[in-house]
C-alpha cells in the first residue's frame, strides 16, 4: 500500500508539472512546442497505473480538472487545424495517415463496433454527440463497419460542424448529416436512434457527465444502446471519467466495459442498454 501511495504521489507530481508547463504556453494551437509537450503528456498516461482520480485531494482534483480543460481546448484546435488541412487537398481521405493518433481512431472504431456487434444487429440510425471538426469516429464506423447506417452528428459549435461536413467521401457524407445543438436541447430526436455515442469531452465534470447521461436515459428509446467514452487510470488526467453508478442511475444496464492496455487505443468506453422502467 505504501509503495502504491508513493507511485500515485509521484504521478500527481508529474502531471502537476505538465499542467504548469501547458498553462504557460502562449497558445495551444499546433506548433512544434505544443505538439512535443502533448506527445510527452499522452505517453505518460499510457502505462498501467493504480491511481483512482476520484480519491485525489482537492488541490490535485483542481489541477486535474484544469488539465482536462486545457487538453480539450488543445484537442479542438488540433482537430480544426487538420480538418482545414485535409479539406484543402483534392483527395482528403488519401492523406489521413498524416494525422496524429490516426491509428487510435481506427482501432477505437473497430473495438466499439466489435463490442456492439456482440449485443445487437447492425443499427439503422446512430447519433454521435460531440462529433467535433474532425468526425473520425463516425466517419470510420460509417465507412468500414456500418455501410448502411445513418449517422447523425451533433456538436454545439456551428464552426466545427462547418468543417466536419467537408471531410469524407461524398457517398459517406450523404449518410452523415451534422446538426448544431446542445445535448440538453435534444429530446424527442434521441428516441429515433438505435445507438447513441457520447464523446469523451461532452460533460467536462463529474456532475455534467452524470446530468448528460441522465438526460440521455430520459429521452432514448427503450432497448437503445449508449456507448459512452471514458478514461481509466492515469488517462483520467486527460479525460473525464464516466461512473458506472451514473450509468445505472440514468436508466441503463451495463453490457460491457473496455479499458485499453498499451497505446493502440487511448479511451475506455462503456456499452449500456436503456432498460424499460
Regions found by a protein language model. Name each.
Residues 39-121:
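Conserved Class I S-adenosyl-L-methionine-dependent methyltransferase catalytic core
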Residues 133-148:
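Conserved SAM-binding loop of SAM-dependent methyltransferases across substrates and taxa
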Residues 150-155:
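Conserved SAM-binding motif I beta-strand of class I
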Residues 163-192:
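S-adenosyl-L-methionine
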Residues 183-184, 192-209:
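A short SAM/SAH-binding and catalytic strip from SAM-dependent methyltransferases
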Residues 210-225:
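A short glycine-rich, Lys/Arg-flanked "PGG" loop and its adjoining helix->strand segment in the class I
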Residues 223-233:
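Conserved beta-strand signature within the Rossmann-like core of class I S-adenosyl-L-methionine
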Residues 256-277:
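Core SAM-dependent methyltransferase catalytic element
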